[in-house]
Amino acid sequence: MWTADEIAQLCYAHYNVRLPKQGKPEPNREWTLLAAVVKIQASANQACDIPEKEVQVTKEVVSMGTGTKCIGQSKMRESGDILNDSHAEIIARRSFQRYLLHQLHLAAVLKEDSIFVPGTQRGLWRLRPDLSFVFFSSHTPCGDASIIPMLEFEEQPCCPVIRSWANNSPVQETENLEDSKDKRNCEDPASPVAKKMRLGTPARSLSNCVAHHGTQESGPVKPDVSSSDLTKEEPDAANGIASGSFRVVDVYRTGAKCVPGETGDLREPGAAYHQVGLLRVKPGRGDRTCSMSCSDKMARWNVLGCQGALLMHFLEKPIYLSAVVIGKCPYSQEAMRRALTGRCEETLVLPRGFGVQELEIQQSGLLFEQSRCAVHRKRGDSPGRLVPCGAAISWSAVPQQPLDVTANGFPQGTTKKEIGSPRARSRISKVELFRSFQKLLSSIADDEQPDSIRVTKKLDTYQEYKDAASAYQEAWGALRRIQPFASWIRNPPDYHQFK
């Protein structure tokens, strides 16, 4: 079928060949994050009895995004012409929506070959049965999936994170991290303390690299587990991992902050810093953001699909991801599963076509060459700070203007005087995707339009079109009735009233 390394290599090659120099990190000074959606197509005329692993497929990158930034709440605009969230995963998903709009235009308007085939109801389309989509990210999503234990070992290979840690509250900190000096040393990739630690990843040791730790302050809540000396009960012989005792000495931290008003992090030293399973918002520089963490958004996609409310008007079923592949980085299989699928497992009554997906989650052993870890290793003792790249790149598999490079939510190079004009809009901003949706709708004869639009009273604003996707809104309402999703931060209505 495909392997995690094949997906990663395809995305890295696409980044190097198809994306321009503009918007990429400055060598040896900046780093960025990468995400993409890969279309998987099973080859035709294969025997039905071929084992799944031997099925021949073609792989194609259909959307890609880079980026590390979010704007604060004070910079949000009611006109929908700014990107609030420019993390790579979100850029890739919005670029994917642009690709889906183009494919719907091919099918519904031009009657040309497309990823969609007619559905059973008038005006609706469904994904071809030989196609699926894999989501790739060079790193674990910010938020819950990035709360990963660091394990200290004596003379034993790298062990996977045990299920009990990943699914419950953090374990107690160990004595050697009580001292604040040692704690700071753990956050320094070059320190002796940090080099003693190895991540609990199933088969691979990640050396000389630690995740970027958050800067949240500590708070006085005790952890649930009374001892940091744990015994691995599930040795993974297939990966050559021996059983034995180990200690969780700290956690890789996420900068994403808990939703205001909800139970917060423990904030104790070492491994007791974070609570797991909570909704989080992305951090801002002094100005709080309204953007939920990538872990939370990806969990939502796994129930509602990646297409969003607008495109659901044209679809018989949501467009789900079949798998998520993560590049080489601090990683925990159990934390990923908890964050993306485990929090949605409570029984949900969902509309027809919607459901909690059994998402396949894998990690590649290939490191993204412009990741923070790779650039830090390459630059050695070079002077100056290593900083995240301020630009974001969007690429979609569409024939016209596939590239979009932004900074601070606007096309790179936009002047203050230009803000508010059409030229100052990203092609994947809310207002531009809405324009593409309206163009698609106006190109379809009235008697061929979907019932959700045809029989509804006159629709005008972005919010009205979203609300008219009744099945999608019903599914979203069902998800928000369970914890932790009841705490989801929603933008005020004024931000969705543009036309």
Swiss-Prot record:
Entry annotation: catalytic residues = E89
The record, for PROSITE patterns, names: A_DEAMIN_EDITASE
Span of domain A to I editase? 63-498
- Keyword Membrane assigned to the entry: answer is no
Report if keyword Hydrolase is assigned.
yes
What Enzyme Commission number(s) apply to this enzyme?
3.5.4.34
Q: Which UniProt keywords apply?
A: Hydrolase, Metal-binding, Phosphoprotein, tRNA processing, Zinc
Q: Which residues does the record list as Phosphoserine (modified residue)? A: S191
Bound how, and how many: what does the cofactor note say? Answer: Binds 1 myo-inositol hexakisphosphate (IP6) per subunit.
Residues annotated as transmembrane: none
Q: Which InterPro entries match?
A: A_deamin
Which reactions are catalysed by this chain? adenosine(37) in tRNA(Ala) + H2O + H(+) = inosine(37) in tRNA(Ala) + NH4(+)
Q: Where does 1D-myo-inositol hexakisphosphate bind?
A: R93, R94, K297, R300, K430, K466
Q: Name one GO molecular function term.
A: metal ion binding
* Residues involved in Zn(2+) binding: H87, C142, C294
Chain residue ranges for the region called Disordered: 170-194, 212-237
List this protein's GO terms for biological process: tRNA processing
Give the protein family: Belongs to the ADAT1 family.
Q: What does this protein do?
A: Specifically deaminates adenosine-37 to inosine in tRNA-Ala.
Identification of the protein by name: tRNA-specific adenosine deaminase 1
Q: Which organism's genome codes for this protein?
A: Mus musculus
Q: Which gene encodes it?
A: Adat1
